[in-house]
């Protein structure tokens, strides 16, 4: 399912099987309800508008969303936002498959910002489970992630200030430039670093 502009899913049931991307809104993709199931060879949910900073986002507000992808589960050129619903993502064959030698198989990927502020999100990713080229904030909701690489990765800054975050499998569980944990519950399992920051780490509460 593809739109050259904005793509909205408000209700109903969608079962999509695609050799490439599952649902793609060029300008934006919003799921605000319904039951959405995607099995794709490429990215499951995608928005790739690259010439407007207010576009290129993927937003899940509500609904039941189940994604199985050969590529990324969610791929947003700007922001990826989850504020509600039940989201289940398996990308790249899952954590047991390991990081692919080519291509990207991340659970949630965004170039600017990732926000999780509600809902229940479960990710089983061959690559990073949650990956932002910019910053991310996990404010509320429940996130459970298994990864063949990093559990939660950000190039700039990560703020965990209320969500319940559990990384069950990873090489590095939480990696970023600046990392702040100020609230919530954070439980990390890794084969390498639990928390790795190239800048500073601030822990005020929440680390299990």
Question: Residue spans of the language-model regions?
Answer:
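Acidic/polar low-complexity surface segments
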Residues: 2-14, 20-207
């Amino acid at each position: 399912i593809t739109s050259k502009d904005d793509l909205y899913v408000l209700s109903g049931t969608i079962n999509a099987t695609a050799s490439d991307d599952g649902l793609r809104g060029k300008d934006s993709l919003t799921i605000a309800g319904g039951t959405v199931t995607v099995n794709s060879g490429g990215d499951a949910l995608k928005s790739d508008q690259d010439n407007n900073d207010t576009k290129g986002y993927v937003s899940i507000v509500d609904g039941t969303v189940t994604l199985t992808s050969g590529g990324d589960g969610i791929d947003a050129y700007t922001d990826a936002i989850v504020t509600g619903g039940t989201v289940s993502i398996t990308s790249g064959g899952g954590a047991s498959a390991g990081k692919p030698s080519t291509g990207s198989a991340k659970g949630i990927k965004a170039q600017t910002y990732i926000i999780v502020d509600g809902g229940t999100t479960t990710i089983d990713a061959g690559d990073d489970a949650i990956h932002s080229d910019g910053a991310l904030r996990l404010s509320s909701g429940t996130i459970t992630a298994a990864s063949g690489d990093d559990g939660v990765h950000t190039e700039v800054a990560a703020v965990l200030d209320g969500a319940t975050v559990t990384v069950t499998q990873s090489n590095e569980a939480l990696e970023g430039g600046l990392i702040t944990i100020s609230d919530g519950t954070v439980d990390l399992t890794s084969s390498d670093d639990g928390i790795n920051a190239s800048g500073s780490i601030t822990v005020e509460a929440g680390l299990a």
